[in-house]
């Protein structure tokens, strides 16, 4: 758009996090305002409706933590559903597993996919061309409702923060529908917000999943571009989860292609729940 640099800020409860750089894209889609900026430190960074979604600098903290605890521990992983994920990072991590036969990516905003394919090739890369991937421009809630029982082995909810058009992705009814379309041993993996900046939402997600599924586990790590810098991912299943039970040979192969995730990192991240969150969950 212009070679002039400017500050773009995300505001949250009296605080702000800003990046200075050249604006590559600024437009409003059917659903949200989309801004893509190029920053000296973070590289290209994507903002949706005033919230930073991803950047080239730190996106692997997010995508590797969302995907690999589930896919490296589950034996059957033929059919995968990604809700959201229009930047391509979750797809990129999924296609590393040869056992996967089909990946359905359901993204409501086609503009996010188009922009990511053109300007964020460093994230999705060749994963967009993987023959196992089918892209559906659709509402994730509606997609889940029309899916037959016991169809997916893993569901990834790679959504933005709760908003007017994404609130239902955090609802009891939606999680129950996800449980219905998962196989009996399937895993739901979702970003579950920050225990600091979005504490109440975070606790609500954890309590809801605990009530709906037989078992759930939450891990914490860093995503510097997000409010407070600490983020979480929660994994839930109708069976007893054992995310530390891994196929050693497969884990070592996947670790070689990761920048952040490895088994030691994962095991530590599952032990990082702040005590104030523990108390809230026990109350």
Curated annotation (Swiss-Prot):
Subcellular location: Cytoplasm
Domain of life: Bacteria
Enzyme class: transferase
Record: residues binding spermidine: 63, 87, 158-161
A GO molecular function held by the record: spermidine synthase activity
Pathway info: Amine and polyamine biosynthesis; spermidine biosynthesis; spermidine from putrescine: step 1/1
BP term (GO), one: spermidine biosynthetic process
Keywords for the protein's UniProt record, in alphabetical order: Cytoplasm, Polyamine biosynthesis, Spermidine biosynthesis, Transferase
Chain ranges of the PABS domain: 5-238
Reaction catalysis annotation: S-adenosyl 3-(methylsulfanyl)propylamine + putrescine = S-methyl-5'-thioadenosine + spermidine + H(+)
Function, in words: Catalyzes the irreversible transfer of a propylamine group from the amino donor S-adenosylmethioninamine (decarboxy-AdoMet) to putrescine (1,4-diaminobutane) to yield spermidine.
Family named by the database record: Belongs to the spermidine/spermine synthase family.
Protein's UniProt name: Polyamine aminopropyltransferase
Organism: Prochlorococcus marinus (strain MIT 9215)
Gene: speE
């Amino acid at each position: 758009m212009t070679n002039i640099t400017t500050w773009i800020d995300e505001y949250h409860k009296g605080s702000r996090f800003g990046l200075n750089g050249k604006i590559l894209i600024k437009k409003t889609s059917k659903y949200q305002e989309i801004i893509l900026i190029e920053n000296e430190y973070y590289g290209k960074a994507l903002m949706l409706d005033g919230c930073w979604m991803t950047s080239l600098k730190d996106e692997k903290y997010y995508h590797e933590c969302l995907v690999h605890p589930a896919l490296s521990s589950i034996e059957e992983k033929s059919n995968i559903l990604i809700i959201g994920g229009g930047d391509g990072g979750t797809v990129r991590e999924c296609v590393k597993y040869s056992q996967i036969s089909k990946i359905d990516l359901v993204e409501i905003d086609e503009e996010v996919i188009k922009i990511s394919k053109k300007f964020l090739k460093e994230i999705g890369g060749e994963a967009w061309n993987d023959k196992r991937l089918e892209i559906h421009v659709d509402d994730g809630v509606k997609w889940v409702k029309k899916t037959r029982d016991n169809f997916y082995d893993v569901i990834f909810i790679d959504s933005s923060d709760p908003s007017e058009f994404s609130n239902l992705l955090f609802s009891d009814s939606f999680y129950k529908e996800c449980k219905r379309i998962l196989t009996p041993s399937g895993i739901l993996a979702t970003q579950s917000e920050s225990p600091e900046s979005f504490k109440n939402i975070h606790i609500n997600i954890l309590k809801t999943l605990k009530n709906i599924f037989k078992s759930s586990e939450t891990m914490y790590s860093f995503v510097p571009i997000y409010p407070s810098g600490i983020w979480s991912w929660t994994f839930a299943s109708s069976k007893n989860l054992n995310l530390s039970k891994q196929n050693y040979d497969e884990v070592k192969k996947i670790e070689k292609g990761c920048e952040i995730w490895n088994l030691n990192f994962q095991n530590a991240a599952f032990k990082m729940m702040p005590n104030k969150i523990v108390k809230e969950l026990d109350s």
